[in-house]
């Protein structure tokens, strides 16, 4: 018998079939679902996020879906707080939290905690944005390369959201984002060595993806085409028509949305939009695989297998998560 209550992480790249498997598991286990997806938190963004259907959500409710307006921001710290609260409620009812999604930073934050980063500073952000307008984003990236070369190596000059945050952390705290994270890693290692855990649950880690990467690429392309057929452009048009949303917001920078937004701005033809949307989704999947390859104690399932439910249940039984 485990001393800590059980939880299940179901991870994987985009278009791998995570939602379907999570629903199948919840049919046979006393599970309640928690979404781990930085785009599914937003209302009115259904098609481009491949959000579970209204019928699915009615029958199999997911926590942390449709909790924010697209004008709002949502951080890994926000997710960790919300997820821990939801997990505690689910556990108190005698059920198992099943966390499903592909935002690997959220899973990592939940499992290991977060570095004690400084809060957002409106004045610093305004100055950085003004500098970017005056001198270009490459200039800001050059500044970051001086104070935090590790972050500069992983943040593209055309990623203003992450670029501003990295410089903001340095200017507010005097410490680079990399230094903050190294400090957190050291604290986590020390806690683990002393027997303490950041997440007070016994976690079983499942991941699902096609064994053949080409199959995943085909699924990504097909799903993007299906989204367009389902009215993805109209969905983004509705967001634009509000008048208070813009391309710099985290919600609109989500994969697919930023390409459609650029198309509606006249920057991309429909063909270019579709091609870039598919490429961006494939790049997202590649980043997700990079995270997953470094994950400890991960049990893989093949998206194309017909017996994933039984395989998942067998694994969960083997690690005593169902005891």
Swiss-Prot record:
SUPFAM superfamilies registered for this protein in UniProt: P-loop containing nucleoside triphosphate hydrolases
UniProt keyword terms in alphabetical order: ATP-binding, Magnesium, Nucleotide-binding, Transferase, tRNA processing
Name of the top EC class for this enzyme: transferase
Keyword Lipoprotein: no
Transmembrane domains' residue ranges: none
Positions bearing the site annotation: Interaction with substrate tRNA: 103, 125
Keyword Membrane tagged: no
EC number: 2.5.1.75
Binding site for substrate: 14-19
Database matches in Gene3D superfamilies: 1.10.20.140, P-loop containing nucleotide triphosphate hydrolases
Catalytically driven reaction(s): adenosine(37) in tRNA + dimethylallyl diphosphate = N(6)-dimethylallyladenosine(37) in tRNA + diphosphate
UniProt: ATP binding residues: 12-19
A GO BP entry: tRNA modification
A Pfam family it matches: IPPT
Region (Interaction with substrate tRNA): 37-40, 161-165
InterPro entries: Dimethylallyltransferase (IPR039657), IPT (IPR018022), P-loop_NTPase (IPR027417)
Cofactor(s) needed: Mg(2+)
Gene Ontology molecular functions: ATP binding; tRNA dimethylallyltransferase activity
PANTHER family per UniProt: TRNA DIMETHYLALLYLTRANSFERASE
Function, in words: Catalyzes the transfer of a dimethylallyl group onto the adenine at position 37 in tRNAs that read codons beginning with uridine, leading to the formation of N6-(dimethylallyl)adenosine (i(6)A).
Family: Belongs to the IPP transferase family.
Subunit structure: Monomer.
Name listed for the protein in its UniProt record: tRNA dimethylallyltransferase
Organism: Pseudomonas syringae pv. tomato (strain ATCC BAA-871 / DC3000)
């Amino acid at each position: 018998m485990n001393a800590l209550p059980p939880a299940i992480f179901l991870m994987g790249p985009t278009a791998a079939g995570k939602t379907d498997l999570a629903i199948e598991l919840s049919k046979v286990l006393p599970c309640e679902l928690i979404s781990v997806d930085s785009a599914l938190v937003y209302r009115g963004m259904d098609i481009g996020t491949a959000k579970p259907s209204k019928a699915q959500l009615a029958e199999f409710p997911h926590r942390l879906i449709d909790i924010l307006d697209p004008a709002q921001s949502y951080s890994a710290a926000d997710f960790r707080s919300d997820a821990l609260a939801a997990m505690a409620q689910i556990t108190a009812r005698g059920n198992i939290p099943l966390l499903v999604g592909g935002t690997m930073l959220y899973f990592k934050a939940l499992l290991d905690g977060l570095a004690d980063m400084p809060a957002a500073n409106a004045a610093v952000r305004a100055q950085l944005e003004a500098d970017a307008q005056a001198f270009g984003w490459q200039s800001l990236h050059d500044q970051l390369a001086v104070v935090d070369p590790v972050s500069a190596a992983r943040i593209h000059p055309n990623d203003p959201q992450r670029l501003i945050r990295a410089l903001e952390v340095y200017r507010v705290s005097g410490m680079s984002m990399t230094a903050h994270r190294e400090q957190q890693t050291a604290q986590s290692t020390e806690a683990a060595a002393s027997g303490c855990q950041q997440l007070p649950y016994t976690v079983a880690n499942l991941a699902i993806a096609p064994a053949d990467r080409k199959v995943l690429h085909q699924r990504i392309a097909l799903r993007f085409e299906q989204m367009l057929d389902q009215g993805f452009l109209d969905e983004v048009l509705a967001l634009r028509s509000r008048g208070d949303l813009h391309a710099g917001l985290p919600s609109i920078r989500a994969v697919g949305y930023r390409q459609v937004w650029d198309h509606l701005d006249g920057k991309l033809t429909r063909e270019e939009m579709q091609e870039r949307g598919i490429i961006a989704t494939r790049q997202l999947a590649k980043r997700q695989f990079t995270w997953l390859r470094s994950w400890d104690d991960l049990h893989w399932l093949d998206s194309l297998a017909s017996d994933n439910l039984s395989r998942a249940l067998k694994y969960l039984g083997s690690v005593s998560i169902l005891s």
